[in-house]
Amino acid sequence: MGLSLGKGIRASVTEAMTSARDEPLLAVRDLRTHFSINAGLLRAVDGVTFDLRSGQTLGIVGESGSGKTVLSRTIMRLNLGNNVHTSGEARFAGRDLLSLPMSEMTEVWGQEIAMVFQDPMTSLNPVVKIGRQVTEHVRKHLGVSKKEAKALAVELLQSVRIPEAEVTISAYPHELSGGMRQRVSIAIALACSPKLLFADEPTTA
């Protein structure tokens, strides 16, 4: 038995599909992050608005200290503290990240949104081996076994061209060069195929 859609229904379905494609993956509206300091109020991010659609790349350009990192950390809810004042909207896949309960936000981190920090030593645990840091991230978000996670960790390190990945998983961050640590951070960020990836200062050494 076949199903025939009337002209009006077909038009509605087409409009809905087009609307879904046109919907921004990330919609930022009048985003502000101010810090209370001894000298008064520091306006690090002051009224930022933009749309980012799936598959697009957006570059935020500005001099050092202009608020680029604060902007991405605000969207990811990483600017914590009693002196931080945030307002506006950051809607990701229809959800306002700024109003999500932190329990839901922790599920978004790493799985749907990831960030590659400028200094990998701030994102890698210096006393935990590389392999464990990758496998714990993978197991938390993908629910795979230890054996599967280890195999995936090696594959991820190989994908970012880390030589002798099978050996590197047993190394500590300080035993790698800065460039290799950055590649590890990239591997972790890409592990769960996030829909949105922030890269802090991607063109620096």
Region locations from a protein language model:
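A short, proline-enriched helix->beta-strand linker immediately N-terminal to the Walker B motif
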Residues: A191-K195
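Catalytic Walker B motif of ABC-type/P-loop ATPase nucleotide-binding domains
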Residues: L197-D200
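Conserved ABC ATPase signature
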Residues: A171-L176, M180
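Conserved ABC transporter NBD signature motif
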Residues: V84-D96
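Conserved ABC ATPase "signature" region
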Residues: D96, E148-V167
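Hydrophobic anchor residue at the start of the ABC signature
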Residues: V134, I186
